[in-house]
Amino acid sequence: CALPIYIFQKKLNTFNKIFRPKVTVENLLTMTSGVTFNESGIVSGNDWLTSYLNSSITGTPGENFQYNSLNTYVLSAIVTERTGQSLTEYLEPRLFAPLGITRYFWETCPKGITKGGWGLFLCTEDMAKLGQLYLQKGKWNDQQIIPEFWVEVSTAKHKESIEGTFGYGYQLWMEARPGSFEFNGMLGQNVIVYPDMNMVVVTNAGNNELFQNCVMLNIIRKHFPRNFHPADILPENPCSQTLLNRLTAELENGIHAPQTLPALRKGGWKKNPPGLRRSTNTRPNTWNYVKGLPAPNPYQFTQQLNGKVFELSPQSIGLFPLFIQIFHNNMTEGVQKISFTCEKGNFSVNFLESGEWHNIPTGFGKFKESWLTLHEESYLIAASGEFTTDENGTAVLKLDFTFLEECVRRKINIFFLPEDEILIRWYETPGKGMIMEGLESITEEISNNFLYGAFKGTGGLELLHRVMEQTIEPVSHGYLVTPAEVAPEQRSVSFLNESDCGELSAEPSETTTTSYSAESL
């Protein structure tokens, strides 16, 4: 592992061949290369390996821990250079097949090299298999898949870490409990191994956290502290099992309290003071609250929305969260129109983007699954809706779009205003907090730059922050433009189950895939 990376000498420019400090495989494994080309640089070019090899180095390789997923990418590139196979091809007969992992996908860079440090899609059960393999010292069904010595050396602490608090091994994080370690993927994807308790814990949370310092992992540490030593196997507990089954059923079926809304009339929403009734003849294009009429249920509301189309302004906000656009290099042009359809009890929210209508079947009190395709890339999503009102009595449709094979989600709140208008607030997870934190880290790195100082002195930094916040959580307006008979095309929607439009269990199952950062492979 201490051998310098000479196999890529041909990719170095003349200056770096002479003066660049040598980076070793050990440096890559322990995140101590010091190479400055990192995840943020991949959007600027297609040859990541050459950019990495010719970028500057801070300090001396091997001294300081600095997490950089491109270190793992270079490890993947080394496998390809030495074997002539991609990392995925190399692992298929040696790891995936013996463990029975058949449903996986690993993204590649523009040059065809497996990304290594991210972009691996695995089922939750298969994530657990990796932890169990390490728990068993690399052995699976009496076959030694990974050398035992490698399991031991890779799970030992080699460096004190910055983001984590317990140290770093070879592509693995140490955990709080002595002897425990963790496969840590960003946004709440983790495999935690407790050898002394013979236990593996897998999480698939989709939160805003990048590393080990997060609420979710602190909860796990709270229940499995250093001094916790479990007794023998617990006896069966039918009462607890019944409660668990009930909770699971509630999550799967999306049990919620009945929703009530103000009455909807043609033209828009109107909030009249109690006791007042306004004739619809005085303002024919306004939906009014009407005293004495019963509040409609969601079905009635969706029927009245059926066929309505709104043109949006601005039209630069994409249906895809920024996270997906950047990491998949699938940039969107922005939603131009939004419409609603309700046919045979099936409600859909439809978005016109890139000249194509995208229909999203939406459940109330439950999720519905469908495929969303943009630029020939398909994404499995689950959508649910909720009708409510804000503090001013304005009717609101809250939409929750979960990208099931990603760790992101898009949330959209649509406010129905008078005069046939809507206001839309767009949110995403990971959201403003994490993205703004990333912006802070970038500005810290360039804080000594003269131009940066001048920019900051003129208030430019505050302006940049405001622009970023408006980009992450934008607001758009919509105006009613077309009658009910103009319906969007249906070709872009695919129900997974035509009988129930693919009702979604709230708990990821073995048939649900997820994107997982798997540096340890």
Segments from the language model and where they lie:
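Alpha-helical scaffold elements that line and support the substrate/ligand-binding pocket
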Residues: C1-P4, L28, Y52, F65-F96, ...
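Structural helix-adjacent loops and short alpha-helical linkers that scaffold large soluble proteins
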Residues: F37-S40, T80-E92, G138-P147
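A conserved catalytic-loop motif detector
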Residues: C123-Y134, K139-S161
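Peripheral terminal and inter-domain segments
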Residues: C239-L521
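Active-site helix/loop module of the DD-peptidase/beta-lactamase fold
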Residues: C1-S33, N54, Q85-W118, L122
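Active-site Gly/Thr loop motif
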Residues: V151-N204
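Flexible glycine/proline-enriched surface loops and loop-helix/loop-strand junctions
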Residues: S56-P61, N71-Y73, C109-G116, A176-R177
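Structured C-terminal helix/loop/strand segments within mature extracytoplasmic catalytic/sensor domains
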Residues: G185-N285
